[in-house]
UniProtKB/Swiss-Prot annotation:
This is DNA integrity scanning protein DisA. Belongs to the DisA family. It comes from the Bacteria. The keyword Transmembrane helix does not apply. It comes from Clostridium botulinum (strain Eklund 17B / Type B). It catalyses: 2 ATP = 3',3'-c-di-AMP + 2 diphosphate. The keyword DNA-binding applies. Participates in a DNA-damage check-point that is active prior to asymmetric division when DNA is damaged. DisA forms globular foci that rapidly scan along the chromosomes during sporulation, searching for lesions. When a lesion is present, DisA pauses at the lesion site. This triggers a cellular response that culminates in a temporary block in sporulation initiation. Also has diadenylate cyclase activity, catalyzing the condensation of 2 ATP molecules into cyclic di-AMP (c-di-AMP). c-di-AMP acts as a signaling molecule that couples DNA integrity with progression of sporulation. The rise in c-di-AMP level generated by DisA while scanning the chromosome, operates as a positive signal that advances sporulation; upon encountering a lesion, the DisA focus arrests at the damaged site and halts c-di-AMP synthesis. Disulfide bonds: none annotated. One of its GO terms (molecular function) is diadenylate cyclase activity. Pfam families: DAC (PF02457), DisA-linker (PF10635).
Length: 354
C-alpha cells in the first residue's frame, strides 16, 4: 500500500471540491468579489476567539453564505457543514502566533487555523483567489479548468511512463524465464514502477480537487494503472533479501527523494544488495509475481511452492510428479501450473502483456 501523504489537506479538499454545497457558496462569494472569512467548526477553541457579530444557528445554504459575506465580519459554520452558527463576527486570535501572510483577512485566517487546528477559508477580494488554512498547512484552491488542464497533461505523461514500464517488465519477464536476470534489470523495473506510482499520486490529488468533475480522469487513470502497484510489490518480494520485510522495503522506496530514485545503487541498497555490481550480479526471482499470473492458483499454494523450490526457475523445471508432492497441489493443479507457465512463456516470447 502507498504511504498516506498529506492526509490533512486531502480530507479538507474532500469537503470543498466542486459539486459540494460549501464550494458553491465559496464560488458565489468569489464571483461577487466581496471577499470573505469562513471558519469551519464551532468548538470552544473557535468560539473563544469570536467577538461581536450575531448568532444565527440557521441551516446552511450557499446563497445565505453569499449574502452574509457582504458584511465585513467572519462567518462560522458548524463542523458538519449543516448550520451557519454566526456571522459578521470579529475574530481575535493570539497575536503572538507567527504568520508571514500579508493582509488582515489572511493573517487572521492563518492564526486562527494554527491556534484552533480548524479549517479556515480566506477569500481575497482583490486577487480573486480562495486560500484554505488547516493548522500549519496553506492551500490555494485553483479553478477547475486549470486543474483539468493539468490533470490531462499528467495523464499524457503517465501514458508514456506506463509504456516504458511495460517494455522494462517484458524484458524482465523474458530474463526470468531464462534465469539470466541481473540486479540492474530488477532495480530498473522497481525504479520505473515507483515513477509511475508517483505520477498516479499527483493525478489522484487533481481528481480530489475536481470532485464530480474528475470522473473521466479517474476512469482513464484506473484503465492505465490496473495492477501496476500489486505487481511492483510482488517484484520487490521476489528480489529483496529479507523476504518478510518486503513491505518495509516498499515503504523505504516511497520515501526516496526524486534524486535518490534516479540512483539505481540507492534502490539496490534498499533491497539489501548494497555494494553489489548492478550489471554483473545475476539474481534469481523467487517467483511470486509470475506464479501470481497463473490462473486459479491460490496465494497459499504459491507460498508452498516457493517454500519448497526456493526459486522460480526450479518451479519451471520441476515435472508434474515433483509439483504434486507440494502441499495443496494435486495432479490436476500440477498440470494447471505447468500449462499456465508454458502459456505465460509463449506470451512473453510474442512480446505480449501478461
Amino acid at each position: 500500500m502507498r504511504l498516506e501523504k498529506g492526509m490533512k489537506i486531502k480530507d479538507t479538499l474532500k469537503i470543498m471540491c466542486p459539486g459540494t454545497q460549501l464550494r458553491e457558496g465559496l464560488e458565489n462569494i468569489l464571483r461577487a468579489k466581496t471577499g470573505g472569512l469562513i471558519v469551519i467548526g464551532d468548538n470552544k477553541e473557535v468560539m473563544d476567539t469570536v467577538d461581536g457579530g450575531f448568532n444565527l444557528n440557521s441551516d446552511y445554504s450557499p446563497s445565505y453564505v453569499y449574502e452574509l459575506a457582504k458584511m465585513d465580519g467572519a462567518i462560522v459554520i458548524s463542523e458538519d457543514l449543516k448550520k451557519i452558527v454566526c456571522a459578521n463576527a470579529q475574530l481575535i486570535p493570539d497575536p503572538s502566533i507567527v504568520t508571514h501572510e500579508t493582509g488582515t483577512r489572511h493573517r487572521t485566517a492563518h492564526r486562527i487555523a494554527k491556534q484552533t487546528n480548524n479549517i479556515v477559508i480566506a477569500i481575497s477580494q482583490r486577487r480573486n483567489i480562495i486560500t484554505v488554512y488547516k493548522g500549519d498547512i496553506k492551500y490555494v484552491l485553483r479553478d477547475s479548468s486549470v486543474i483539468l488542464a493539468r490533470a490531462n497533461q499528467a495523464i499524457q505523461t503517465l501514458e508514456k511512463y506506463v509504456s516504458v514500464l511495460e517494455r522494462v517488465i517484458n524484458n524482465l519477464n523474458l530474463l526470468e524465464f531464462q534465469d539470466l536476470t541481473t540486479l540492474f534489470d530488477v532495480v530498473t523495473a522497481i525504479q520505473r514502477t515507483e515513477m509511475v506510482m508517483r505520477i498516479v499520486e499527483e493525478i489522484n490529488m487533481y481528481i480530489l480537487e475536481l470532485g464530480n468533475e474528475g470522473r473521466l480522469i479517474s476512469m482513464q487513470l484506473n484503465e492505465l494503472v490496473k495492477h501496476i502497484e500489486r505487481d511492483g510489490i510482488l517484484l520487490i518480494r521476489d528480489y529483496c533479501k529479507d523476504e518478510d520485510g518486503h513491505n518495509e522495503v516498499y515503504e523505504q522506496i516511497q520515501k526516496l527523494s526524486a534524486t535518490e530514485l534516479l540512483d539505481l545503487d540507492a534502490i539496490a541498497r534498499v533491497l539489501g544488495h548494497a555494494g553489489e555490481s548492478l550489471v554483473d550480479t545475476l539474481i534469481s526471482a523467487k517467483g511470486y509475481r509470475i506464479l501470481g499470473k497463473v490462473p486459479r492458483i491460490p496465494s497459499t499454494v504459491i507460498e508452498n511452492l516457493i517454500k519448497e523450490f526456493k526459486e522460480l526457475n526450479s518451479v519451471i523445471e520441476a515435472d508434474i510428479d515433483e509439483l504434486d508432492i507440494v502441499e495443496g497441489i494435486g495432479e490436476a493443479r500440477a498440470k494447471a501450473i505447468k500449462d499456465g507457465l508454458k502459456r505465460i512463456r509463449e506470451q512473453i516470447l510474442l512480446n505480449k502483456k501478461i
